[in-house]
């Protein structure tokens, strides 16, 4: 989701190059068509606006066209420097990064949860059918009792979550670390996103769902989002994408990109609030 530019575009290209069958979505349909035509491995695309109520339905259509889904990657987001606190900009940021984020991530999570429940039910039915056949065979089943018991244990293990783990990976930001006065709605929504992902990770364990969550926190990336700005330590989208794909494939839960920003975030967290608000007020 959000594959028409920036990090989302680079991650889609890299996943396709790594052998994944990729479905892409975003608001700009012409960009989606161009990407699909130019990138082997991108097998489906769909125009989706995360701020629209029908966006989850469109996501389900894309999943159906793909024939299933193992990974949902969310990179849709907007943000501005907004020292003047323009209300329209603030509300648009909340609409996309807040409402749109929850709308799509919860839709992906619920789809995975339903699939896991259906798969577990099917495995249980298959195990029950095998047990019935073994019982009907009488003495033969008795001789092969140990084998049947072993199969039952294997089925139970699979039902308890040993199947391939689904994964939801989302781009938040280092902006979630502290409130940034220059971008109030942006940093606030990024904080919300990080907490929401943490909640889903906890809920997946509570419900014994085999769904992994990856929270990706990049620093300033040279994309359209910050075009024309003079932010320091800007990262290349291609480099960030490579780190993201590695993190996904390794099952990382949280990754801050890159090492310089990990040091910066650690320093930010040590600053007390009374000092932080004074530091950021200095021009």
Across the structure, where does each feature detected by a protein language model lie?
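C-terminal helical subdomain
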Residues: 215, 227-265
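Short alpha-helical oligomerization interface
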Residues: 82-95
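Active-site helix of classical SDR
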Residues: 105, 189
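Rossmann-fold cofactor-recognition segment
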Residues: 39-54
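Residue(s) in the substrate-gating loop at a strand-loop-helix junction
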Residues: 173
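Conserved glycine-rich cofactor-binding loop
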Residues: 4-5
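Conserved NAD(P)H cofactor-binding loop of Rossmann-fold oxidoreductase domains
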Residues: 75-81
